[in-house]
Amino acid sequence: MAKYIFVTGGVASSVGKGITVASIGRLLKARGVRVSVQKLDPYINVDPGTMSPYQHGEVFVTEDGAETDLDLGHYERFIDVNLTRLSNVTTGQIYSAVIQKERRGDYLGGTIQVIPHITNEIKARIAAVARQTGAEVVIVEIGGTVGDIEGLPFLEAIRQMRKDVGRDNVLYIHVTLLPHIGATGEVKTKPTQHSVMELRRVGITADVIVCRSDYPIADEIRDKIALFADVDVEAVVPLHTVESIYEVPLVLEEAGLGNYLTLRLGLGVREPNLDDWRDLVARIKAPKRKLAIALVGKYVELHDAYISVVEALRHAGLHQGVDVDIRWISSEQIEEEGCEPLLRDVYGIVVPGGFGDRGIEGKIAAAGYAREHGVPYLGLCLGMQVATISFARHVIGAESRANSTEFDLHTPHPVIDFMPDQLDITDKGGTMRLGGYPCRLLPGTRAHAAYGVDQVVERHRHRFEFNNKYRRLLESAGLVVSGQSPDGRLVEIIELRDHPWYVGVQFHPEFRSRPERPHPLFRDFIAAAAQTFREGDQRPLPLEQNGTVGAAVKA
């Protein structure tokens, strides 16, 4: 039977539950435990797919096409596992499923109530993860903060789980904040005491308290929390703010959490193998020269909107021995000030995914600037589309008004257009091209050189595609279609041959990057940018016969 770790949060939101859960997963995996993870989100949306990035941050897409919480990205990166739609459950999904069953008559005329119908549906979703993944331990994060009215059915469900699967198979972890009062230099425990009491009111007694703080906490603070929370002192785990999120597993391991969890769950003492992770953290903290990379978007005020892109850039920088210095550039600011003052000091430009026409001309301009000045460029989803639009305007003429029908339904040159199967769709949620799809690569290209194989699978999230009516025209002018669907109908990757490194992809490679294994496209993009930095200017690099950039780039 699988065992379950339920992680709740108290005092304040955004204290680091997601990173804590991901780190616990890493500690257990390092001990040879088969782990899976699930996030329970109390919001009533069915998924975050239609939510504003300002409300929710990034929408993380799983291999099977689910639009999920950004915490799943942390889980995948830390544990190095591909999760599925089972790993993200929302109140909207739960109520939709229960109402559908009621409409079918599955409840035989019974009155539908939160208990037992809603809670049973939640428990069924939790159990499904263990059943379908074969995990020994399922770690379940409950979104929000204890005391939120939306979270009550989820707390009741996880309370019942201890009775359903046995007390020895369930463990509750509460992540809480210890505020530091600057005027007195004190760390206050009272909010944590109240949070633990609030959790007890719904019938849950925490087995472990993870204490988030900006500074290391003294032993007397741990003793005090252990007394009031009625837990072992070793179950009060200090977690102070660290330089890199990838340090967190090592901080928790040093505090003894890994061994404590395995002993409490009856898994025995297992020696962890964290050598590779320690090496990773050492490389992260080692001094490196900074490499300025521009990230051009319209949500740059909220970095969480592009969190997987940021992490993928950092992974690649770590691999290439540079510290990626991300310059957050608003595409609307480019529209106002032009590219030169904002982009002249960067050595690579990334335009990530997005929707809507706000700031779109700034993104198109950034793609054009990279093309004209020989700056390495990586376009992701929308970033590939704006690169296509920019190139088309260059080929056909600026007055052509080449565009995407997403931004101009009446453009005379729709080089980016609706996918045919999207034309009759009216609902927004869950209706895009979502999840992993195969892409066949063209030998002798940057893309093929990066991957080193003939076909790959990458994750998608889009409605619009490259318009094949313009393919021959643009190819004749120097555009290279280096990746396409196996049937040849969909253009997936474009690049420019006479350029240091200029690649646009219709998918989201950032979702598959790992700290120990950077995504090939990000790796080679940063390599090209680093080479440009070494040479001190932007100039074309030779494309060797096997499709790799010059040997100096690979150095």
From Swiss-Prot:
Activity regulation: Allosterically activated by GTP, when glutamine is the substrate; GTP has no effect on the reaction when ammonia is the substrate. The allosteric effector GTP functions by stabilizing the protein conformation that binds the tetrahedral intermediate(s) formed during glutamine hydrolysis. Inhibited by the product CTP, via allosteric rather than competitive inhibition.
Metabolic or biological pathway: Pyrimidine metabolism; CTP biosynthesis via de novo pathway; CTP from UDP: step 2/2
E.C. designation(s): 6.3.4.2
Binding locations of L-glutamine: 54, 354, 382-385, 406, 463
Positions of region (Amidoligase domain): 1-267
Binding site for CTP: 13, 148-150, 188-193, 224
Record's catalysed reaction(s): UTP + L-glutamine + ATP + H2O = CTP + L-glutamate + ADP + phosphate + 2 H(+); L-glutamine + H2O = L-glutamate + NH4(+); UTP + NH4(+) + ATP = CTP + ADP + phosphate + 2 H(+)
Cellular component annotations (GO), alphabetically ordered: cytosol
Protein family according to the UniProt entry: Belongs to the CTP synthase family.
The protein's role, per its UniProt record: Catalyzes the ATP-dependent amination of UTP to CTP with either L-glutamine or ammonia as the source of nitrogen. Regulates intracellular CTP levels through interactions with the four ribonucleotide triphosphates.
Miscellaneous remark of the record: CTPSs have evolved a hybrid strategy for distinguishing between UTP and CTP. The overlapping regions of the product feedback inhibitory and substrate sites recognize a common feature in both compounds, the triphosphate moiety. To differentiate isosteric substrate and product pyrimidine rings, an additional pocket far from the expected kinase/ligase catalytic site, specifically recognizes the cytosine and ribose portions of the product inhibitor.
Name the record gives this protein: CTP synthase
Protein's gene: pyrG
